[in-house]
Amino acid sequence: MESKSPGYITPKKPALSASARKIKDNAADWHNLMLKWETYNNDSFNIASKIVNLKITAESADRMLLDEPSPNKDNITTDKVELDRLCSELLQTIENMEKIWTKMEKITATFKGICDLEAYQFPGDTSKPTHFHTWPTTLFYETSMKMVDMYKKEIQLKRTIVGDLAHTSDQDLRMVYLSCWLYQPYIDNNIKVLLESMLLETGHRPI
């Protein structure tokens, strides 16, 4: 009788709880939203740069027109139309960035909801579950809060810049605005570390 080799069964990973699945989805959503934000930030910086360059050109033309007996009104009208178009485009991009920030806020609220649920299910000093490796659920919430607060301050700064960029005649201030827009002073360099730590903890990145 032919002997059979013993079969080896690869143990299955335990199924994630509903809370763990939501936390993992939230971490992925954070990653995707941050990528979208960076795309919008680069696009809006290019638009803002065009606005500044157009304003510089228009101001130079205004000075030249003072010496001309018959100014070219067509060029003036064309520049104004283009400036209005760029300003509208910049405002639309900012609105898209605000929508991203709103989604980040909702993710943070979801983390808070999971924390509240676990506090109810495991009251007092009762040990609360660790869904992945080492992070308690509260750490996901705290990390999300840190990140969303950075984006909140950044969107407020951008709103201020948008309100003044096309109107100020101070060239140095324009350059400061553009620099702030590109380098996003309220978003700390360690935000990538925070995100990557979250992705590592939830298994989106190999350890």
Swiss-Prot record:
Family to which this protein belongs: Belongs to the CINP family.
Designated name of the protein: Cyclin-dependent kinase 2-interacting protein
A biological process term (GO) from this entry: ribosomal large subunit biogenesis
GO cellular component annotations of the record: nucleus
Coiled-coil intervals, chain numbering: 78-99
Subcellular location field: Nucleus
Any GO molecular function: preribosome binding
Function per UniProt: Component of the DNA replication complex, which interacts with two kinases, CDK2 and CDC7, thereby providing a functional and physical link between CDK2 and CDC7 during firing of the origins of replication. Regulates ATR-mediated checkpoint signaling in response to DNA damage. Part of the 55LCC heterohexameric ATPase complex which is chromatin-associated and promotes replisome proteostasis to maintain replication fork progression and genome stability. Required for replication fork progression, sister chromatid cohesion, and chromosome stability.
Gene that encodes it: cinp
Quaternary data: Homodimer. Part of the 55LCC heterohexameric ATPase complex.
Matches recorded under InterPro entries: Cyclin-dep_Kinase_2_interact (IPR023250)
Keywords associated with the record: Cell cycle, Cell division, Coiled coil, DNA damage, DNA repair, DNA replication, Nucleus, Ribosome biogenesis
Domain of life: Eukaryota
